[in-house]
Swiss-Prot record:
GO terms for biological process: ectoine biosynthetic process. Catalyzes the circularization of gamma-N-acetyl-alpha,gamma-diaminobutyric acid (ADABA) to ectoine (1,4,5,6-tetrahydro-2-methyl-4-pyrimidine carboxylic acid), which is an excellent osmoprotectant. This is L-ectoine synthase. Keywords: Lyase.
Length: 129
């Protein structure tokens, strides 16, 4: 059994900061669960281009309000607390935060914890060995 406290992740290498977000990575590939779990804060007033070509992601919003737009078709989904969205087709998307948003993100395959978005919004596949 593994128990991870958010307070033990904050300020470590498992807390990764981007221009628009902070990702506290709670479970990683090394934990052997087959997925990774992140507690992520998206900053109010930002737009983030994301395209997980190598990962599927489910995102549960626990605080805040924003929207997700799929680039392929321009469809926009409002997102608020207590809603989940799943990027089940490696959807290229824009995440816009109207307020600070706190999200619980689950990735498959799991990330190693070293990843950050590249210029296309992609997390590369990283071997942590």
């Amino acid at each position: 059994m593994k128990v991870v406290k958010l307070e033990d992740v904050i300020g470590t290498e498992q807390e990764v900061k981007g221009e628009n977000w902070t990702s506290r990575r709670l479970l990683l590939k090394k934990d052997g669960m087959g997925y990774s779990v992140h507690d992520t804060i998206i900053k109010a007033g930002t737009e983030t281009h994301i395209w997980y070509q190598n990962h599927l992601e489910a995102v549960y919003c626990i605080e805040g309000e924003g929207e997700v737009e799929t680039v392929k078709d321009g469809k926009v989904w409002p997102i608020k607390a207590n809603e989940i969205y799943a990027l089940d087709e490696h959807d290229e998307h824009l995440l816009r935060a109207k307020t600070d948003m706190r999200m619980v993100c689950v990735f498959n395959p799991p990330i190693t914890g070293k990843e950050t978005h590249d210029e296309n919004g992609v997390y590369p596949l990283v071997d942590d060995e």
